[in-house]
């Protein structure tokens, strides 16, 4: 876990980087899961559940963008595409 670092601060950085990497992976995984759940509900033509899943996915996209996990424009693009799918379901 400590790699090849000899300096105390470098050892600490390796440790914190590993913690952050695990946390970021967890958040990204939850984000992908939320998007997949939304798309599954759209696929089943379940408008009410899709709306709730859309809100959840949008929330997770915004949080990921605020934390710098994904670029804000990437989050915006994803939200736009999800909204388009939701609106297509209503029509």
Curated annotation (Swiss-Prot):
Keyword RNA-binding among record annotations: yes
Superkingdom: Bacteria
InterPro entries registered for this protein in UniProt: Ribosomal_bS20 (IPR002583), Ribosomal_bS20_sf (IPR036510)
GO annotation, biological process: translation
Alphabetical UniProt keywords: Ribonucleoprotein, Ribosomal protein, RNA-binding, rRNA-binding
Gene3D superfamilies assigned: Ribosomal protein S20 (1.20.58.110)
Cellular component GO terms, alphabetical: cytosol; small ribosomal subunit
Region described as Disordered: 72-91
Pfam families xref list: Ribosomal_S20p
Gene Ontology MF annotations: small ribosomal subunit rRNA binding; structural constituent of ribosome
Record NCBIfam families: S20
HAMAP family from the UniProt entry: Ribosomal_bS20 (MF_00500)
Function of the protein: Binds directly to 16S ribosomal RNA.
Protein family membership: Belongs to the bacterial ribosomal protein bS20 family.
Official protein name in the record: Small ribosomal subunit protein bS20
Species per Swiss-Prot/TrEMBL record: Halalkalibacterium halodurans (strain ATCC BAA-125 / DSM 18197 / FERM 7344 / JCM 9153 / C-125) (Bacillus halodurans)
């Amino acid at each position: 876990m400590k790699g090849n670092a000899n300096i105390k601060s470098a050892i600490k950085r390796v440790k914190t980087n590993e913690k952050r990497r695990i946390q970021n992976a967890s958040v990204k995984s939850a984000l992908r899961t939320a998007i997949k759940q939304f798309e599954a509900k759209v696929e089943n033509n379940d408008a009410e559940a899709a709306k709730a899943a859309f809100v959840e996915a949008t929330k997770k996209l915004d949080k990921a963008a605020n934390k710098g996990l994904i670029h804000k424009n990437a989050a915006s693009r994803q939200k736009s595409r999800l909204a388009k799918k939701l609106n297509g379901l209503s029509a």
